Amino acid sequence: MDQLTIERQAPVIAQYDAVVCGGGPAGWVAAVSAARNGCRTALIEKMSYLGGTPTAGLVDPISGGYHKGKRVLGGVGWEFVERLVAAGAGQVELPKGHVSFDPEYYKLLAQRMVLEAGVELYTNTVVSACQMADGRVTHVLIESKDGLQALAAGTVIDATGDGLVCRRAGVPMQVSAGGMQPMSLCFLLRNVDVTTALLRDHIHHTGLHGQSKHMGIYHALQKLAEQGEDVPQFGGPWFNSTMQEDLICVNITRAAANAADRAQLTQAECRMREDAYKLVALLRKLYPEFAKASIAEIAAQGGVRETYHIRGLYTLSGADILGGAPCADGVAFCSHPVDIHSAQDNTQTAQYFDTPCPVPYRVMVAAGFDNLIAAG
């Protein structure tokens, strides 16, 4: 392969105490927290809006805010939920504490909270590289319509979802021994009758506490496949509220790919876009509730479950998660079960734990890098 050597200059346009790369849930919340604690903070996001997986990926609901009826979600995240609910754009369904939300209002509220905190927001901007010196990230290089620029950084938070900044900095990465979990491409479906027994216990905005994953539809699709019908690979399916009566969010497509690989990601998203229409056509044939259904919107990006993991100062083990032992540097609690989706078929496993799992700060700090933290 031919190689090009390119020399470019990047003006240093600003200096920040904290530069957060990625405006998904982990990123924008980290930026708000940093700014509220007195840091001059920049938030870099490739899309024109914030939210990441919940908005660009249409992954709904926000899962696991409660554990056995007790709230474990706190801080900026819970403040966000309270403001969603107050605006009529979200609903907390007990006892699990799943939060149904309006994806468009999510974008607006995240933006409001970021700007209210004094964060300097860089949308439509990508992180291209970082500059290192003595084991520290000194500058983050960004590209936008303004060209290549640099931000001087005291601390860098990598909330890109696939460790992009960490990989650029040379942090050792690892992948799961069993391979990466598959991704999904969610979509919004209009003209679905959610008032009958088929769906009403699976849609969060009804206020009922039914399981979101629809085993009845799962088995019906499996049966069609066994009969020789052309059924694309699927997961779930899950049907969730958007807080709008005429739109539901559907999580059903599935593709095994490394989402940190451009070619694999392109192929997977193209295939899942085709699969979404095939699966909706099958649902129209199977159930009168879907007879008039049509796709209103397909997510702008795939819902990625897994890519790379950093090697931090500490690695959270299965025993840590299932044991729920307290730790001195815990910064958050996880109450969602450990669910592993198979890349080979449409199955998944889930492990539930007795007590919420504390997430230690040590797992997010890149080993050997003083000022680089991975979140999300």
Residue ranges of predicted features:
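Extreme N-terminal leader/targeting segments of oxidoreductases
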Residues: 1-18
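Flavin (FAD/FMN)-binding glycine-rich loop and adjacent Rossmann-like elements that form
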Residues: 5, 9, 53, 143, ...
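Conserved N-terminal/central alpha/beta ligand/cofactor-binding core
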Residues: 7, 15, 33, 39-40, ...
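Conserved acidic residues
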Residues: 17, 138, 154
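Glycine-rich Rossmann-fold phosphate-binding loop(s) that bind the pyrophosphate
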Residues: 22-25
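Short, hydrophobic/aromatic-rich segments at coil-to-beta transitions
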Residues: 134-140
